[in-house]
Amino acid sequence: MSFNSKASKYQAENTVDKLFSNILHTTTPKSVSNTNTKTKTKTKTKTKPISSTQLLVNQLQSSNTNSNSNTKRKKHNINKRINKTLLEEKKFSKFIKYNHIKQKSIKSESDEKYLHKLIRKNINSLNKINKIDDLLIDEELNQIKLELLANESNVGNVGIGHFKGGKRLRKKLLNNNKEQEEFDGFGNISNNKGKKNSHPGLTPGLAPVDYEEEEEEE
């Protein structure tokens, strides 16, 4: 078969090779060579050695990122401290301003408002701190408060014995007073019980040797 040119011959050979490859499911030597060249180029691009300068650049970049993160942390900590000191100074200035004793004529309306606000705030904080965790004690205290209020509305004046448990407290106080009357500070009996059947110069309850009860009767 004669061809007009080399290009037409090359094209005809390619078409025939493609037909055979499709029928027989085989690869032509040209296609094999093409695939080999492609893989070679890929391996060349993959196994490209890294220069020492590139390594140094990479190390510097990583160190720069670390230093930047450290500086950011330091700045954040410094700002935090500054804000804390500013708040403390503000609180201290308010404390000096409003705890300074002034006359009512000198105080302005804004001062009075702020003082009332400050008082309420302090009362709330104290109530939170003094809140009793034990429910039983809290209930007992509430009961005593209610009883005191009820007695106050009925009588007007509230004493120790007006609420439950007051009688016991009163008895306890009376017993303590009696004990204090019976003994002086040195452990000796100081009331009339000790003076009965006692004589000067002797221990309480003993009489002198020459003492006779008949003389006492005379």
UniProtKB/Swiss-Prot annotation:
Coarse class of the protein's main subcellular location: nucleus
Annotated coiled-coil positions are none
Subcellular localization, per the record? Answer: Nucleus, Nucleolus
Q: Which UniProt keywords apply?
A: Nucleus, Transcription, Transcription regulation
**One Pfam short name:** RRT14
Q: Where is this region: Disordered?
A: 28-53, 59-78, 180-218
The UniProt entry's GO CC annotations, sorted and at most eight, read: nucleolus
InterPro entries the record matches: Rrt14 (IPR031404)
Specify residue ranges for compositional bias: Low complexity. 28-38, 59-70
Q: Which family does it belong to?
A: Belongs to the RRT14 family.
Described function: Involved in ribosome biogenesis, probably through modulation of rDNA transcription.
Q: What is this protein called?
A: Regulator of rDNA transcription 14
* Annotated source species: Candida dubliniensis (strain CD36 / ATCC MYA-646 / CBS 7987 / NCPF 3949 / NRRL Y-17841)
